Amino acid sequence: MTGLPDAPEVPPVAVEIFGTRTGSAARYVELLATDGVERGLIGPRETDRLWDRHVLNCAVLADVVPVQADVVDVGSGAGLPGIPLALARPDLRVVLLEPMERRCRFLHEVVATIGLEDQISVVRGRAPDAGIGPDGRRFGIAVARAVAPLERLGAILFPMLRPGGVMLAMRGSRILEELQDARSGLGTQGWHPVDVVRCGEGRVEEPARVLRAVRSSQRTRAESRGGRGDGERHDGRQVRRTSRDSLRSREVGRDQPTRGQSRST
């Protein structure tokens, strides 16, 4: 590992988000900056931004995940967003689904090193088939980070979620344009309501932009005839408050009440 950059220092906000697991989060960042770069999972130019752009950006996704949810991270790669999400929320059970063997080896090593083997499982395979258990078990939450265009991603994740389950797709600055293009197709697939939320605003340097969509009980074209669904909602609550608030959410699988308003489809 000679010549590889050092892991960046732990920012103060990491303690707020990870609490007693901050040390484990720091160890994960160190592994990303060393083994992750050496194995081609993280670009060397990203090491200075590992906390803000990657780990914290993914961890604040916890703001919109309900208590004790079973989560699948589709196309996990280097463990983003699944590992930061699990570190921030010990109540969750997380499956990292990844088709590439070399990435799975890295994920197994990371999970063992940071001591999350009781909380995180690594599964090698492709969605959606590999993400459904032999007993037909489906998940309550599916998360993905830059895996596929939204409409295609919706088709992949739909069979992996039980009715009322939630897709959380992390996207970039063009998220509203992407939603505009994919809205009709997502509705036809059976996603309703659909909205955009911003997680971690006011706490982290780079808030997460997330498309949130609820899986209906069946696929119907009528699902695509609702409202516009192109507003952004702002989720700035602290992670610790999320667990209590999400129990009072009126929708199955939705997050705690958030600041701001959005329109949904």
UniProtKB/Swiss-Prot annotation:
Protein's cellular compartments: Cytoplasm
- CDD domains membership: AdoMet_MTases
Q: Which residues form a coiled coil?
A: none
- Indicate yes or no for the key word Methyltransferase: yes
For this record, the Gene Ontology CC terms, alphabetical, are: cytosol
Give the region (Disordered) as residue ranges: 212-265
For this chain, one GO molecular function annotation is: rRNA (guanine-N7-)-methyltransferase activity
- Which Enzyme Commission numbers does its entry carry? 2.1.1.-
Is the keyword 4Fe-4S assigned to this protein? no
Residues binding S-adenosyl-L-methionine are 75, 80, 145
This protein's UniProt keywords: Cytoplasm, Methyltransferase, rRNA processing, S-adenosyl-L-methionine, Transferase
Biased composition regions of type Basic and acidic residues, renumbered to the chain: 220-257
Query: What top-level branch of life does the organism fall under?
Result: Bacteria
Q: Which NCBIfam families match?
A: rsmG_gidB
Q: Which HAMAP family match?
A: 16SrRNA_methyltr_G
Task: State the family it belongs to.
Answer: Belongs to the methyltransferase superfamily. RNA methyltransferase RsmG family.
According to its UniProt entry, the function of this protein is described as: Specifically methylates the N7 position of guanine in position 518 of 16S rRNA.
Q: What is this protein called?
A: Ribosomal RNA small subunit methyltransferase G
| The encoding gene | rsmG
